């Protein structure tokens, strides 16, 4: 007799929906897994799948601070942060991060996803025109939808198209990433600010992939460009360079007084716990003094970008994120397998993170990579580029 629990049949429309996903996303692949699921890296492989750009996830100072805080904090408040907005309850880390980035206030959130949705839901009245770079993170698109605003995409980093969109639809909100998470390009923030000023638009910059890596002491690209007084709002994920979890929304003090009581992600999520905040505080301390790691990160990234371009790849990256543009899903699967057989592991980006037949394999460089690692990656990529059955944009 089987011990397998009996389940009632699903409604046919649900069954059909799930069957469609299984066939469309899984069963058509050679390994009968989703395209993002290749081999498991073995010892000695070069793995470029993590956003831990400064290699802090194994930092002993940070781990010890977190461990001590877990033992010390026995007064955890497992509730929504909406109840913790008085001055005595707000974590000092919010003030520290605001001063670090150069903004008036900071609010922690559960994730970068929650930060972007909560911010746009708060600042956008229904039907507000929101001008969004085509490559901006999906959480910004979802924030527009949650706000009931109107998305007006503009071509990637194309200021002429942005101008035409604003002239056609009027004053609104411009949202961009500082460093784009798919192909590693950098937003022309000065030009975007000038456009926002000319047309009286609010400006939101997601610094998830530049906070900690760019700017003085890692304080971000906005601060590096001396635009903190011109950019209205900054959002970040603290699951990248901060190598943990949570997000943050930075802006004027008026935002901090209102968003916790308006934004659904803030109201209907539990607060970040005290021991987690201790870890984030220690991480910020380490990041501030990590100029050597930032120098090494950009050195390795430049080595990889230069080497790939010399091979013949079309590389658009200007940062520590480097993408091989592989096109179709079948070709991407073949490229992934080819590289992984040679102990080179990137992260596959496919729909819905990219457009159909616009798949990429993303290499996220980290500060602990060596010149030997880069040489190994370039050797494998040279072989892939010359392979008659593999295609690249």
UniProtKB/Swiss-Prot annotation:
Family matches, as Gene3D superfamilies: Aspartate Aminotransferase, domain 1 (3.90.1150.10), Type I PLP-dependent aspartate aminotransferase-like (Major domain) (3.40.640.10)
UniProt cofactor(s): pyridoxal 5'-phosphate
BP-aspect Gene Ontology terms: biotin biosynthetic process
Group of enzyme by EC: transferase
Disulfide bonds: none
GO function terms (MF aspect): 8-amino-7-oxononanoate synthase activity; pyridoxal phosphate binding; transaminase activity
Pfam family, one: Aminotran_1_2
InterPro entries, per database record: Aminotransferase_I/II_large (IPR004839), AON_synthase_class-II (IPR050087), PyrdxlP-dep_Trfase (IPR015424), PyrdxlP-dep_Trfase_major (IPR015421), PyrdxlP-dep_Trfase_small (IPR015422)
Domain of life according to the entry: Bacteria
Positions where N6-(pyridoxal phosphate)lysine occurs in the chain: 240
Record key words, sorted: Acyltransferase, Aminotransferase, Pyridoxal phosphate, Transferase
EC numbers for this chain: 2.3.-.-
Family of the protein in this entry: Belongs to the class-II pyridoxal-phosphate-dependent aminotransferase family.
Function statement: Required for the synthesis of the quorum-sensing autoinducer CAI-1 ((S)-3-hydroxytridecan-4-one) which probably functions as an intragenus signal.
Protein name listed in UniProt: CAI-1 autoinducer synthase
Encoding gene per record: cqsA
């Amino acid at each position: 007799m089987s011990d397998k629990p009996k389940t009632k049949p699903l409604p046919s429309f649900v069954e059909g929906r799930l069957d469609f996903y299984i066939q469309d996303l899984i069963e058509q692949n050679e390994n009968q897994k989703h395209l993002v699921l290749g081999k498991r890296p073995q010892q000695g492989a070069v793995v470029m799948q993590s956003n831990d750009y400064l290699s802090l996830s194994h930092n002993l100072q940070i781990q010890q601070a977190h461990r001590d805080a877990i033992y010390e904090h026995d007064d955890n408040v497992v509730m929504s942060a909406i109840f913790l907005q008085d001055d005595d309850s707000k974590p000092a880390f919010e003030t520290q991060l605001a001063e670090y980035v150069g903004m008036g206030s900071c609010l922690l959130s559960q994730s970068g996803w929650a930060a972007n949705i909560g911010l746009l839901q708060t600042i956008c009245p229904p039907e507000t025109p929101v001008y969004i770079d085509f490559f901006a993170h999906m959480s910004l698109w979802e924030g527009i939808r949650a706000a009931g605003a109107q998305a007006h995409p503009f071509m990637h980093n194309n200021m002429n198209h942005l101008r035409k969109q604003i002239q056609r639809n009027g004053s609104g909100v411009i949202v961009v990433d500082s460093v784009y998470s798919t192909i590693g390009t950098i937003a022309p923030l000065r030009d975007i600010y000038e456009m926002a000023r000319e047309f009286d638009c609010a400006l939101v910059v997601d610094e998830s992939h530049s906070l900690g890596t760019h700017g003085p002491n890692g304080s971000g690209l906005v601060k590096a460009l001396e635009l903190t007084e011109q950019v209205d709002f900054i959002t970040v994920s603290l699951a990248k360079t901060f190598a943990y979890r949570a997000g943050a929304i930075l802006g004027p003090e008026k935002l901090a007084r209102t968003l916790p009581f308006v934004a659904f992600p803030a109201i209907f999520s539990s607060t970040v716990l005290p021991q987690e905040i201790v870890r984030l505080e220690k991480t910020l301390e380490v990041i501030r003094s990590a100029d050597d790691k930032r120098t090494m990160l950009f050195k390795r990234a430049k080595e990889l970008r230069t080497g790939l371009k010399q091979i013949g790849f079309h590389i658009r990256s200007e940062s520590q994120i480097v993408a091989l543009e592989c096109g179709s899903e079948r070709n991407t699967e073949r490229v992934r397998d080819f590289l992984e057989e040679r102990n080179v592991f990137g992260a596959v980006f496919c729909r819905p993170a990219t457009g159909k037949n616009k798949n990429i394999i993303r290499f996220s460089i980290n500060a602990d990579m060596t010149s030997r690692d880069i040489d190994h990656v370039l050797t494998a990529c040279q072989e892939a580029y010359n392979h008659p059955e593999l295609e690249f944009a």
